[in-house]
Amino acid sequence: MRTLAILAAILLVALQAQAEPLQARADEVAAAPEQIPADNPEVVVSLAWDESLAPKHPGSRKNVACYCRIPACLAGERRYGTCIYQGRLWAFCC
């Protein structure tokens, strides 16, 4: 029983250690809100990420433009995740 309690404590500490950097990033994003017109269905998002997570386009070394769109990505784009803006879910498309 003691071992189970120790393992649970270690797991909670590990999860908290991973959550702190995510909270710091969320705080940075929340600190700098952008003013975007409500009638604009397209939102341009600038993100910093690990290169290993970047979209791979064979034969292309150009920068990839990514957008948050409703309801879905346009033809030729691929969905890489979800954006949350003004309480709504958007497709993150590149």
Curated annotation (Swiss-Prot):
Subcellular compartments: Secreted
Residues carrying ADP-ribosylarginine: 78, 88
Top-rank taxon: Eukaryota
Pfam family of the protein (one): Defensin_1
Quaternary organization: Tetramer. Dimer. Interacts with RETN.
Recorded family membership: Belongs to the alpha-defensin family.
Role this protein plays: Effector molecule of the innate immune system that acts via antibiotic-like properties against a broad array of infectious agents including bacteria, fungi, and viruses or by promoting the activation and maturation of some APCs. Interacts with the essential precursor of cell wall synthesis lipid II to inhibit bacterial cell wall synthesis. Inhibits adenovirus infection via inhibition of viral disassembly at the vertex region, thereby restricting the release of internal capsid protein pVI, which is required for endosomal membrane penetration during cell entry.
Protein's name in the database: Neutrophil defensin 1
Source organism: Pan troglodytes (Chimpanzee)
